[in-house]
Amino acid sequence: MHILIVGPRQVGKSTLIQKVLDAVGKPVCGFATKREDALYNPELGYPIYIYPAHGPRIQTSDNLLGYCHDRKPDVNTEVFETFAKTLQETPAIGSVILMDELGFMESHAEQFKATVLKHLDGNVPVIAAVKEKNTPFLDQVKNHPNCKCFFINEENRDELTDMVIDYLKKQF
C-alpha cells in the first residue's frame, strides 16, 4: 500500500517524508513542490515551483506552478499538465515515487491528476504529502483503496516517522 502523509500547512509533512526516504535508502523519482519565500513579489505573492525529486532546483517559467497571494492561488495549469508527462515515465525497479505535495492547485489539471491516480493504482511504492483539505481530487486520493493515510500533527510527528519507515520497508 502507498503512504499518504496528511496534515495541515507547516506541520512537517515534507520533513517527515525526507527522513523516511533517507532511512529507506531507495532511489526516488517523482516531484516536490515548494513555495519560494525568498522570491516573494508584493504584487503577485509567493511563487510555487514544481521540481523533479532529484536534481537541481532551478526556477524557470517552465516549472512555475503559480503564485499564492493572501492564500488565493493563481495557477498555471499548463505547467502541471506538462509535468504530468515526466511523471508518466516508468520508475526504476526498486524505487519510490515521491509526490510532495498534493493540494488544491492541481484541481483543474486533469492529465496530472490522472497520472497521480494511475501511480496509486500501480505497484511502485508512493509516498505523498497531502494537504488537509477537502476537494474532489484530494478526497479521491485519501480514499484510494491502495493507500494508507498517516495523519500528522505537532504532537505525533516524531513518533510517526518511525512508524512510516517501518511501513515503507515492508513494501519492498
Residue ranges and their predicted role:
Residues 2:
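Walker A (P-loop) ATP-phosphate-binding motif of ABC ATPase nucleotide-binding domains
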Residues 5:
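Hydrophobic anchor at the beta1->P-loop junction of P-loop NTPases
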Residues 9:
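The conserved Walker
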Residues 13:
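Conserved lysine of the Walker
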Residues 16, 20:
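Hydrophobic positions on the alpha1 helix immediately C-terminal to the Walker A/P-loop
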Residues 22-70:
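N-terminal phosphate/diphosphate-binding loop that engages ATP/GTP or pyrophosphate donors
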Residues 67-117:
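Phosphate-binding/switch loop-helix module in NTP-utilizing enzymes
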